[in-house]
Amino acid sequence: MKVIIVKDNVEGGKEGYKLFADAKKNGATTFGLATGSTPITTYQEIIKSDLDFTDSISINLDEYVGLPEDSDQSYDYFMHENLFNAKPFKHSYLPNGRAADLEAEAKHYDQIIEDNPIDLQILGIGRNGHIGFNEPGTPADSTTHKVSLTQSTIDANARFFEHEEDVPRYAISMGLASIMKSKHILIEAYGEDKADAIKGMIEGPVTTDLPASVLQNHDNVTVIIDEAAASKLSNK
């Protein structure tokens, strides 16, 4: 893993943007995207730039199950607000969390990934080491699947909802094996509350107890973290 330690998430966003710009320059056509607060500064830098994605495809990591189509908490809404409205893609794929048959939707999504290999995948990491909605215990060979969210993830996402009971209990997420197919993986993390997860991901054993640790088995991972998230690393 290549580790880049930055002052804060603003500087991290600039570093993340550089990877998107380099990927585009080198012919990348398919980008794996993530939601949440972590990638926002990278998306802001992309929006300010002259990068054009109208010839590119985006594939998002995950989506909540069961939210109304017009919900402003859906990841589809998030992506339009934070990137797509300003930088449209030729085609943008997100899992359909309202599908009547979620198992069939998961297989369909895996086929999309198979047909459009991801050149650059951006990730955040949860405090418990989850990537996408792949919670601790998720097998390394997992493909797109329905996920029961852990209480810690529900608690972390509750700030985006009016009431804690409004937070969905299920999501549909690319699996760890799906993510590992990406040619280049960028993972960003900011803040001291991510320090334990980052240490485990980089320096700990590869274990299903910390899903992000599987990234040690990928040969092209860039980690962008601030000093607080890097604070528990032995080698900096």
UniProtKB/Swiss-Prot annotation:
<dbReference type="InterPro" id="IPR006148">
    <property type="entry name" value="Glc/Gal-6P_isomerase"/>
</dbReference>
<dbReference type="InterPro" id="IPR004547">
    <property type="entry name" value="Glucosamine6P_isomerase"/>
</dbReference>
<feature type="active site" description="Proton acceptor; for enolization step">
    <location>
        <position position="62"/>
    </location>
</feature>
<feature type="active site" description="For ring-opening step">
    <location>
        <position position="128"/>
    </location>
</feature>
<dbReference type="GO" id="GO:0004342">
    <property type="term" value="F:glucosamine-6-phosphate deaminase activity"/>
</dbReference>
<dbReference type="GO" id="GO:0042802">
    <property type="term" value="F:identical protein binding"/>
</dbReference>
<protein>
    <recommendedName>
        <fullName>Glucosamine-6-phosphate deaminase</fullName>
        <ecNumber>3.5.99.6</ecNumber>
    </recommendedName>
</protein>
<comment type="similarity">
    <text>Belongs to the glucosamine/galactosamine-6-phosphate isomerase family. NagB subfamily.</text>
</comment>
<dbReference type="GO" id="GO:0019262">
    <property type="term" value="P:N-acetylneuraminate catabolic process"/>
</dbReference>
<keyword id="KW-0378">Hydrolase</keyword>
<dbReference type="InterPro" id="IPR037171">
    <property type="entry name" value="NagB/RpiA_transferase-like"/>
</dbReference>
<dbReference type="Pfam" id="PF01182">
    <property type="entry name" value="Glucosamine_iso"/>
</dbReference>
<dbReference type="GO" id="GO:0006043">
    <property type="term" value="P:glucosamine catabolic process"/>
</dbReference>
<feature type="active site" description="For ring-opening step">
    <location>
        <position position="135"/>
    </location>
</feature>
<comment type="pathway">
    <text>Amino-sugar metabolism; N-acetylneuraminate degradation; D-fructose 6-phosphate from N-acetylneuraminate: step 5/5.</text>
</comment>
<dbReference type="GO" id="GO:0005737">
    <property type="term" value="C:cytoplasm"/>
</dbReference>
<dbReference type="GO" id="GO:0005975">
    <property type="term" value="P:carbohydrate metabolic process"/>
</dbReference>
<dbReference type="GO" id="GO:0006046">
    <property type="term" value="P:N-acetylglucosamine catabolic process"/>
</dbReference>
<comment type="function">
    <text>Catalyzes the reversible isomerization-deamination of glucosamine 6-phosphate (GlcN6P) to form fructose 6-phosphate (Fru6P) and ammonium ion.</text>
</comment>
<keyword id="KW-0119">Carbohydrate metabolism</keyword>
<feature type="active site" description="Proton acceptor; for ring-opening step">
    <location>
        <position position="130"/>
    </location>
</feature>
<dbReference type="InterPro" id="IPR018321">
    <property type="entry name" value="Glucosamine6P_isomerase_CS"/>
</dbReference>
